[in-house]
Structures are given as C-alpha cells and as structure tokens.
C-alpha cells in the first residue's frame, strides 16, 4: 500500500481557456457579413423607386397646356390609341388578297414577317399603298399593333388634306398675279418713255434738216450774186 505524503505539494489543476470571446467575435463577423448585402439591396430598391417616381412625374404632364403655350400640335388620345393598337379588324379584312403563282410577277418571294418562302397557290395579303405581300396570318398579327408596312414602313392610314396647303397656294397665286400686273405696267411706262424720246429725236432731225436747207439756199444765192457781178464786169 502506498500512502500519500501530507507534506507533498498538491498538483494544481489546469483549466482550458474559454472560447467565449472568440465565439462572440465570430458571431459579430457573421452578422456583419449578412447585414451588408441586405443594406445594399435596400439602398438599390430605394434608388429605383425614386427614379420610378421621377419618370411618372415627367410623363404625367399637362400636354394640353404645353400645346397652348407652344402653339404646336398635340396628339389626342384617339390618335395615340390608333397608333398603339394598330388597324381595326374590319380594315384588316378589307386588304386585297392575292394568290401566289410562280408565273405571276410578285415583288417578294418570301414573307418579311416570318421569313418563310411563298408556296404555289398560297393566299397572300397585299398592301395597297406599297404593293408588298405577306402571309395572311403574319400581316394580320402585325397590323394588330402597327399601322405601317413591316418592310418599307409606309403608313396605311391616308393623310388628311390640310386647308393650309390650299390657302398657301391661293396666296402664292395672288402674289404672282400682283407681280404680273406690276410687270405689265412697267413695259407700258417704258414704251411711253421710248415713244417720247423718239418724237424728240424726229423733231430735232427735222430742225437740223431745215437749217441745212436754209444754209444751202443762202449759199446758192451768194453764188448767183457773184456770178451776176462777174458778168456785169465783163460787159462793162
């Protein structure tokens, strides 16, 4: 048997260091990592919301007041709806239908909407304004949201004749007539001045001829007088 010595120093108990401080630091670090992307997403959403509000505020402008101030044409709601929605079904059905044949001269050999080739005896729909042809289903779907030809973008809606053009032509014609009247009066005045100058020239010519004739008569008289004097001298 072994007996413990009471004078022997007891061995001190060693305790492992606590990991409480490290665990707290790890939790704070994890919380920071998760909070950063969340805060970033909130900031991005807030910025997008502000941009959305600004766009709505700029689009919701009183266009009628702007049109009255600027004096420009402002499209009405009916014009916008027709431009956005395209042609009605009745108008689409009124478009001419053409049967495609290889011998028949057609501008296009394939549909510009679906890029599919035309087959013989296939029904196509033709644009009356430009003459381009398309598949009936393709052009019908296109014209539900557009009012132009999908190939050349020519509008199918006829433009209304404006009275301003008629008035402008009338104004131009009246101006031309007035200018023509002035031009007709100018030759008359010129002809009158030419006639007056011609009469003056004629009168001056007559005066010159009369003076010349008088001078010739005086010369003849002088010559006759000298000849008579010579004859008397000879006779004497």
Curated annotation (Swiss-Prot):
Pathway: Protein modification; protein ubiquitination. Its EC number is 2.3.2.27. Residues 197-221 have a biased composition (Basic and acidic residues). One of its GO terms (molecular function) is transferase activity. GO terms for cellular component: membrane. It comes from the Eukaryota. SMART domains: RING. Pfam families: zf-RING_2. Residues 176-236 are annotated as: Disordered. It catalyses: S-ubiquitinyl-[E2 ubiquitin-conjugating enzyme]-L-cysteine + [acceptor protein]-L-lysine = [E2 ubiquitin-conjugating enzyme]-L-cysteine + N(6)-ubiquitinyl-[acceptor protein]-L-lysine. GO terms for biological process: protein ubiquitination. A zinc finger (RING-type) spans 111-153. The keyword Membrane applies. It is found in: Membrane. Residues 176-196 have a biased composition (Polar residues). The chain crosses the membrane at residues 31-51. Keywords: Membrane, Metal-binding, Transferase, Transmembrane, Transmembrane helix, Ubl conjugation pathway, Zinc, Zinc-finger. It is a single-pass membrane protein. The keyword Membrane applies. CDD domains: RING-H2_EL5-like. InterPro entries: RING-type_E3_ubiquitin-ligase (IPR053070), Znf_RING (IPR001841), Znf_RING/FYVE/PHD (IPR013083). The RING-type zinc finger domain mediates binding to an E2 ubiquitin-conjugating enzyme. Belongs to the RING-type zinc finger family. ATL subfamily. This is RING-H2 finger protein ATL7.
């Amino acid at each position: 048997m072994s007996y413990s010595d009471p004078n022997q120093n007891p061995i001190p108990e060693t305790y492992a260091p606590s990991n409480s401080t490290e665990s707290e630091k790890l939790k704070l670090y994890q919380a920071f990592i998760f909070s950063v992307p969340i805060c970033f997403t909130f900031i991005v959403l807030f910025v997008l919301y502000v941009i959305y509000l600004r766009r709505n505020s700029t689009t919701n402008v009183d266009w009628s007041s702007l049109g009255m101030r600027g004096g420009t044409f402002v499209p009405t709601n009916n014009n916008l709806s027709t431009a956005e929605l395209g042609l009605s079904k009745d108008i689409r059905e009124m478009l001419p239908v053409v049967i495609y044949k290889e011998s028949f001269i057609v501008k296009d050999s394939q549909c510009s909407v679906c890029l599919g080739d035309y087959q013989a005896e296939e029904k196509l729909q033709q644009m009356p304004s430009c003459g381009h042809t398309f598949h009936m289903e393709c052009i019908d779907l296109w014209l539900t949201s557009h009012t132009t030809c999908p190939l050349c973008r020519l509008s199918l809606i006829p433009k209304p004749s404006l009275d301003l053009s008629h008035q402008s032509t009338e104004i131009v014609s009246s101006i031309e007539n007035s200018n023509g009247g002035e031009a007709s009066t100018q030759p008359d005045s010129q002809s009158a001045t030419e006639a007056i100058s011609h009469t003056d020239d004629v009168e001056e010519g007559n005066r010159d001829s009369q003076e010349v004739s008088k001078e010739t008569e005086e010369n003849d008289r002088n010559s006759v007088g000298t000849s008579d004097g010579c004859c008397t001298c000879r006779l004497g």
